[in-house]
Amino acid sequence: MSGETTRLTEPQLRELAARGAAELDGATATDMLRWTDETFGDIGGAGGGVSGHRGWTTCNYVVASNMADAVLVDLAAKVRPGVPVIFLDTGYHFVETIGTRDAIESVYDVRVLNVTPEHTVAEQDELLGKDLFARNPHECCRLRKVVPLGKTLRGYSAWVTGLRRVDAPTRANAPLVSFDETFKLVKVNPLAAWTDQDVQEYIADNDVLVNPLVREGYPSIGCAPCTAKPAEGADPRSGRWQGLAKTECGLHAS
């Protein structure tokens, strides 16, 4: 891919975020994605264009997916065929998650951008010692998730996430649209108001791909060493970083 990235200035992005928050209060997920596409879909993009399976699309926003399911991917692809979808390949994912990523790229009209850290797991072990995730999980997440994502998002004016308010107490007030103070771009959360029932109904009605681990009792899926099955009825994210003073990986700090 070739070409120059076109990204709006921070004042422009802040203004658009405020406008979107006002205009989209109570909007459906599809309406939010349409607004995102109308606002950011044709003003330049990473590398001057992203190749979709069935053609080329120029897009100045990106969708992020942890590959737990393809609900957001399905919604976004219907609005913008060929939309770029970021997957943070930390090197620690379950085999099932990698398989879901590959299946999603095959089934949906999207382009999966496989984003990797600067160092492989083996290189990180050599530099910082084995199993950094157990000794300093915040630093491990920073190196393998936050930094790589930040570098990738520099090429875009907005990112779309699957963040939901019911996921955890830390996400209870997640806005639909905001300016992301961490990555300095517009952040859109089309599923923020969705309940678990909303997700399940959409999956059933649209035959959406789901990570096999979800069926096995993992409602929140991250890196394999830091993900366990939560107790029945517990916070869905309580299986993440069990025994550690950590509840978020740092991607959704703002």
UniProtKB/Swiss-Prot annotation:
Cofactor: [4Fe-4S] cluster
Keyword terms, alphabetized: Cytoplasm, Iron, Iron-sulfur, Metal-binding, Oxidoreductase
Name of the top EC class for this enzyme: oxidoreductase
Compartments where located: Cytoplasm
Major site of localization recorded for this protein: cytoplasm
An MF annotation (GO) of this entry: adenylyl-sulfate reductase (thioredoxin) activity
Binding site for adenosine 5'-phosphosulfate: 64, 88, 162, 167
Superkingdom, taxonomy of origin: Bacteria
Notes on activation and inhibition: Inhibited by adenosine 5'-diphosphate (ADP).
Pathway participation: Sulfur metabolism; hydrogen sulfide biosynthesis; sulfite from sulfate
Entry annotation: catalytic residues: 249 (nucleophile)
Gene3D superfamilies: HUPs
Keyword hit for Iron: yes
Gene Ontology, cellular component aspect: cytosol; plasma membrane
Subunit structure comment from the entry: Monomer.
Function description: Catalyzes the formation of sulfite from adenosine 5'-phosphosulfate (APS) using thioredoxin as an electron donor.
Similarity remark: Belongs to the PAPS reductase family. CysH subfamily.
Additional comment: Was identified as a high-confidence drug target. Inhibitors that target the Fe-S cluster have been developed and studied.
Alphabetical list of HAMAP family matching this protein: CysH
Protein name: Adenosine 5'-phosphosulfate reductase
Organism: Mycobacterium tuberculosis (strain ATCC 25618 / H37Rv)
Gene name, Swiss-Prot/TrEMBL: cysH
